[in-house]
């Protein structure tokens, strides 16, 4: 991204468990309005890296910065505008979309005891609907719908909406299209593109390479805890990406 300051930046980040080096000297930058995909084989370090990016796990060494300020915890990262959606989504299925969106705020501030008690239902629905409209998410038309009645794709979108209710700098997604059918995958990818178009920085982990190539601006390939390639997604194929992931043709992969 030309002449832009990064929204989220990692500087020489390492993570070590005893003698095992999960991450080694990772440097990356994410910019407003772009979609970055972290790709790598199982055990490459993707989940560890994303947990460090969202503040859920401290690095052994190195810095994690949001708009130039170092973060030191999950709560601090959230306050700085970093939203995270894990693969299991962690939605309360007996609650509505709106209640889940506000529950995310309350669990971060007052804990379960204060959850949802500070706002009446009508106001909650109104504000949740306004946020959905602002984000341009057309697939969640009724925020009063219980999560248990949503499709798999709609649940993923509801989790994204919850993360973005209070975090507006960057969104991190762990396997957002896992176990979804083609129609639901399309719904989620369109939501991701809509969010990025509004200026959000988005980073995702995915094994679904065709979906990644359909939505990502940049690819970062991890191997054994190191980013070995950073390159535009445009022009890449499933075959070329897999070759980079396993280490074939390293001399030409980044050309």
Where do the language-model regions lie?
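Glycine-rich phosphate-binding loops of nucleotide-dependent enzymes
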Residues: 2-255
């Amino acid at each position: 991204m030309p002449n832009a300051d990064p929204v989220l930046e990692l500087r020489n980040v390492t993570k070590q468990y005893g003698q095992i080096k999960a991450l080694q000297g990772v440097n990356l930058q994410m910019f407003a309005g772009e979609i970055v995909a972290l790709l790598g084989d199982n055990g490459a370090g993707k989940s560890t890296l994303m947990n460090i990016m969202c503040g859920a796990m401290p690095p052994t060494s190195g810095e994690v910065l949001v708009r130039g300020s170092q973060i030191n915890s999950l709560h601090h990262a959230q306050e700085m505008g970093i939203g995270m959606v894990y693969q299991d989504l962690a939605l309360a299925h007996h609650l509505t979309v709106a209640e889940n969106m506000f529950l995310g705020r309350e669990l971060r501030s007052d804990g379960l005891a204060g959850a949802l008690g500070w706002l009446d239902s009508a106001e909650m629905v109104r504000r949740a609907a306004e946020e959905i409209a602002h984000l341009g998410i057309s697939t969640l038309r009724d925020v009063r719908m219980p999560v248990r009645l949503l499709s798999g794709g709609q649940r993923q979108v509801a989790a994204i909406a919850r993360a973005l209710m209070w975090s507006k700098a960057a969104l991190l997604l762990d396997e957002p299209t896992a176990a979804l059918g083609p129609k639901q995958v399309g719904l989620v990818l369109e939501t991701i593109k809509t969010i990025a178009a509004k200026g959000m920085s988005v980073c995702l982990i995915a094994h679904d390479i065709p979906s990644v190539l359909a939505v990502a601006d940049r690819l970062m390939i991890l191997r054994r805890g190191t980013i070995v390639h950073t390159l535009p997604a445009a022009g890449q194929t499933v075959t070329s990406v897999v070759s980079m992931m396993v280490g074939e043709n390293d001399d030409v992969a980044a050309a």
